[in-house]
Amino acid sequence: MIWALVNDLGQRAVSLNKWEQRRSLRRRLQTLALPPGSKALDFGCGTGLFASTFSRSGLTYHGYDIDSGVVSYARRMYPGQVFASAREEIAHYGPFDLVVANCCFHHIPDDVLAEELEWVKRILADRGAFLLIDIVVRPEDRSVLRRAFRTLERGAFLRRAEEYVAIVARHLVVKRVGEDRSYMLSIPGSPVYNDLVVVECGK
């Protein structure tokens, strides 16, 4: 629980409470134009930092993370929301109209991702949407500041944009691929940022 608290406070401090990322996610959720009350799954939800963003967008929120410690913390932080660390428990609430994997795939190796994506496909509604947002590695980027910023994510499996797309395309139908940036302290135009890939898929 202490680690979950430290992780939560650290992320909020570095990103000014995820202000910029919340705004970007809210815009993407609005673009999907899902009916009010649609069931959304926050895959790899961590401490539930984006729970309120989903709810304020009119969606019924569910958070899933394999780390039972952060899930316990999230339940205390957002007592009105559903959080689970077991597949069986969260699948009970499906099928989901939307599954969002927001900056968590860079913590997962390819073979495990294949299993997770097959599971996502099973719990996704027939006309549901899957949205991947994740940090991309750019070997040509020599910025010491940006490299240091990326290390804060502690992800052992950062990939190129095309590698994320290829992995997802083996399991789901890729509809759109875009790019975005996540700036340190949520300051647009700052030289310290993470490049992101955004992949929208159907079943």
What are these regions (language model features)?
Residues 100:
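A conserved beta-strand element that flanks and buttresses the S-adenosyl-L-methionine
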Residues 103-107:
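Short catalytic micro-motifs in class I SAM-dependent methyltransferases
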Residues 1-37, 46-92, 108-112, 119, ...:
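Class I (Rossmann-like) S-adenosyl-L-methionine-dependent methyltransferase catalytic domain
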